[in-house]
Amino acid sequence: MVADASQQGQSNGAAFNQQQQYQQQQQRQLFGGEEEFGDEEELGDDVDLVVGDYSAAFAGEAGAEVDEAQAAALAAAHAQAQQQAQAAALAAVPDQIRKYVVLFNQAVQINNVQDISNAYEGTWNRLTDKFYARSEWPEAETIAPLVNDDQKFLTLYRELWYRHVYSRLSPDGEDRFHSYDNYCDFFNFVLNSDGPVQLELPAQWLWDIIDEFIYQFQSFSQWRNKVSNKSEDEIALLQDGGVWSSYSVLNVLYSLIQKSRITEQLVAASKGEDPDEVAGEFGSKPLYRMLGYFSIIGLLRVHVLLGDYTLALKMLDHIELNKKSGLINRVTACHVTAYYYVGFAYLMLRRYPDCIKSFTHILVFIMRLRQYHTRSYQYDQINKTADRMYALLSMACALCPTRLDENIQTQMRDKYGDQFSKMTRPGAEGLAAFEELFIYACPKFITANSPAYHDEEALVEYKQKAVFPDPTQHQLRVFLSDVKTQLSNANVRSFLRLYTTLGTDKLASFLEIDEEELVEMMMVMKNSTRSLKWSSGSLLHGQVVNTSDLDFVIDTDMVHIAESRVGRRYGDWFLRNGTRMHDVLNNIQAKPLPIVSKQVQDEAAAAAAEAKDAKDKKVKNAWAAGVKAGPPAFSQRSGGAGRSSVNKSAPAPAGAWGSSKPQPSVTA
């Protein structure tokens, strides 16, 4: 009986081991084998439900019952094996990486912002290029013994770890879900504490956290909508719609704004009051103040991605973009991002003058920045954004002819000169140029609603669609609807440019249409060339202006035309280039003279002495030849008939041959 019981226990243990191995294999496929950490409350309760549901399903498949003693023994053995595996993995980590992690953790613990900034912006990228350019960094569980399992640092480390996976590698479904869990842990740590957390991070890192959080939300939304290449495990994960949902992302950003009271601080600053008086306990801390401020810019971006351009601009009611001393200028990437999305929102709202002004301002800033900012790890990303803004600027200028800065005009012509010339012509060629630049330069739009992964029948029906809904194509159609209206009026403009006054009957005969149809066409044309232009106040405020270089008024049956051509400012051109030449000369004069070695100096001196000797010798030989030839013929005396006919009373020749007073030379 004892032997039978022992054999039965061994068979049960083997079955349980097989069950555990199968369960771990499935979890690695679904979640990457990472364990949940921390007991903080999650922003979305559904995050923890995924693991629990699948664990229950796996246990049900095995159907094995194990008593508590055996389960405890197996758990202890599993923990020991896991510790041994982690120790082996830690031993494989290079010494330079381990030292970096220890020093990085020490800087975070003592809130040394300067050391954190150096470790984050400089050392991390250098070590990545050296050790992990095409592979993952060590997992947080591997380096946990080096930092005494400090969850605060491990959460920050995981944020960098997943960002590296997104930027250098290709994230899979489990990476996307685990990254969301980690962001939930971080934001719960910041938002749900009884008081301000004892953590200080550089402004650049805080902006990157918000920026990366929105980027991963955007990436997940696009990945989620591609239902054709999803496995069954990924579909099971995606049935939980709370992960990376629009509601959860917006909830985080609005919560950070509310917690930091950044809106109240900005209002107080605009009135000349002290922002610290209204900041409160949390808003007075740099961590909360900067996270709240960057969340405003983040909401601008999210609302543009969702296609709500009016609400996007509404988010910046209390931010002065043109203020040089504002918080927006502390981080270059934040500054560029804000202007990019503001300019694009203006473009989609048909406010072309404001769009051109926004893009011109930030492109001039980037142009001046390039000579100082090449060391930044974000330099390439800023340049890519600048190229996209040049494309959007060329579209806005094609729809609203405007005088631009000479440097911006030159750059835009060099990059998109061919497309710009096409966009000014009506027809399919012009529309194709607009479409090409829009697809290239627009943001990666997302949809708030996901496919029905929870409904199998609806999902099958969704997969059978020939064309899946694409938010980018939808926004393109919205934009091109206005472009088509403006391009269709090109024929009317060509006739109006030839006259200052023209009868409607005559113009209708030119176009071969009725007068009523002509008046309707001209009213559509006039409306399409009217737009708001910001002058002060909120970004949504503005005055109605004409966006075309041609304007007209219809008085009964007569059309009065006024054309305003964009002229070139020659005075500004000369002033700008004169100042540039002056700066170049000052720069050249300020540079030190080149240091020449002693050997080169000696060689140059010897060559100069040799050249001087040769020159002196040549002069001496010429002098000797002149003396040997004798005096000039006109100074020689000869008797008789052969005597010279030179006038004796004439003055003697100058120089050594005659008077000491210099005289004009005479031909010998």
From Swiss-Prot:
Keywords annotated in UniProt: Cytoplasm, Initiation factor, Protein biosynthesis
One BP annotation, GO: translational initiation
Molecular function GO labels: translation initiation factor activity
Ranges of compositional bias, category Acidic residues: 33-42
Region Disordered: start-end pairs: 1-42, 625-668
Gene Ontology CC annotation, any one: eukaryotic translation initiation factor 3 complex
Pfam families noted in UniProt: Paf67
InterPro entries: eIF3l, PCI_dom
Feature: compositional bias, Low complexity: 18-32, 648-662
Secretion signal span: none
UniProt biased composition (Polar residues): 1-17
Domain PCI: 358-552
Keyword set includes Transmembrane: no
Subcellular localization: Cytoplasm
Family in the record: Belongs to the eIF-3 subunit L family.
SUBUNIT field: Component of the eukaryotic translation initiation factor 3 (eIF-3) complex.
Biological role: Component of the eukaryotic translation initiation factor 3 (eIF-3) complex, which is involved in protein synthesis of a specialized repertoire of mRNAs and, together with other initiation factors, stimulates binding of mRNA and methionyl-tRNAi to the 40S ribosome. The eIF-3 complex specifically targets and initiates translation of a subset of mRNAs involved in cell proliferation.
This protein's name: Eukaryotic translation initiation factor 3 subunit L
Gene source species: Mycosarcoma maydis (Corn smut fungus)
